[in-house]
Amino acid sequence: MTKKQLHLVIVTGMSGAGKTVAIQSFEDLGYFTIDNMPPALLPKFLQLVEIKEDNPKLALVVDMRSRSFFSEIQAVLDELENQDGLDFKILFLDAADKELVARYKETRRSHPLAADGRILDGIKLERELLAPLKNMSQNVVDTTELTPRELRKTLAEQFSDQEQAQSFRIEVMSFGFKYGIPIDADLVFDVRFLPNPYYLPELRNQTGVDEPVYDYVMNHPESEDFYQHLLALIEPILPSYQKEGKSVLTIAMGCTGGQHRSVAFAKRLVQDLSKNWSVNEGHRDKDRRKETVNRS
């Protein structure tokens, strides 16, 4: 039986260089993550990890917040080098002194190594102490000119494998404008201009997932024309969302009550996008009127 390999990324570097954003990015990439892991506990922790999946992935922030960091890190890394079944890399995040000072001033935090309160003194001491670790690192990322989004994209490019690259997911949902626009929607489209099945007694109590309503909505010429334009707009931009490191794209289709037109459009959009992408379908307000009637 082939032994499963554990993939580990040790995230470290200068305070204020972006380790919090980095560890969140690794979580989005499918890694199990821990922030502020004491170096001395790392070998024991790896021994206790119960490997349930092929090629498990861990990303751990190990930095100077642990008081014993500088005295323990080298011995721990030497031990990891000799551990069977472990593939580990060190990601070192850095930034220019001027940028680090600006970030500390913006957050009004004090540097942990600035005994006299001068941020720059703490940065210089930390840089000196971390120099050997930086030289050992397989991946060094300078975040001076990077926004959080750009850092996420950089890490996705460096640490995504083929499986992770395909983990981009699309959520297609319907909703009713009368109940508010979904706050997590990335793209919102309004189909209230289309003929409304609500005004047909035989369709009023059905929804867009029911065939009579779906056919009524989608068989109108203006519906087909709009849908083709909608699909032509959405499909070409999906690779760009994936490339920038976005893990979930939420597309919301809205009509007045969220029961008929938007549901039908969301249903058809899911059918077409599912041919090439991982897509989930949801209808936020589809059954809202039914629930209201049942309460009365």
UniProtKB/Swiss-Prot annotation:
- Highest taxon of the source? Bacteria
Q: Which residues bind GTP?
A: D63, M64, R65, S66
Q: Which GO MF terms are attached to this record? A: ATP binding; GTP binding
Membrane-spanning ranges: none
Residues annotated as binding ATP are G13, M14, S15, G16, A17, G18, K19, T20
Annotated coiled-coil segments of the chain: none
User: Which keywords does the record carry?
Assistant: ATP-binding, GTP-binding, Nucleotide-binding
Which InterPro entries does the entry link to?
P-loop_NTPase, RapZ-like, RapZ-like_N, RapZ_C
**NCBIfam families under this entry?**
PRK05416.1
Relate the protein's function as given in its record: Displays ATPase and GTPase activities.
Family statement: Belongs to the RapZ-like family.
Check the record and name the PANTHER family matching this protein: RNASE ADAPTER PROTEIN RAPZ
Name by which UniProt lists this protein? Nucleotide-binding protein SPH_1680
Species of the source: Streptococcus pneumoniae (strain Hungary19A-6)
Q: What is the lineage of its organism?
A: Bacteria, Bacillati, Bacillota, Bacilli, Lactobacillales
